[in-house]
């Protein structure tokens, strides 16, 4: 994680937390939806990121880092730390879903680039869309893992 994070100028803790949330760091993980590997890449995302073997740990981490970096760039107009949370939702749901939610928020006269506004939308609409509930849990868990990773000296060798 550390080596790959350096290539993209990313915080390696984020990559490790994403990998843990996605697969518990198990390279052979496969979801019923077809995503696989440590970073649980879809086949299309893997191809777009240059990954030929999603269950190869190095390729999966490389592909996940590249994709997360693209999501961060996509939301570069949003200030940190909010940009991180938007990028995580996009990593989880896809950027098209985030764009659609932002469009709805804008139409409601709300700030579509504010994390709490996005979070509240996802939270209040999760009964109508299971992906919203999943996105809330995804970001919440990764934020928790980030704190744990940053405060656990034993994890510094990931």
State the predicted function of each range.
Residues 1-158:
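Catalytic glycan-binding domains that act on GlcNAc-containing polysaccharides
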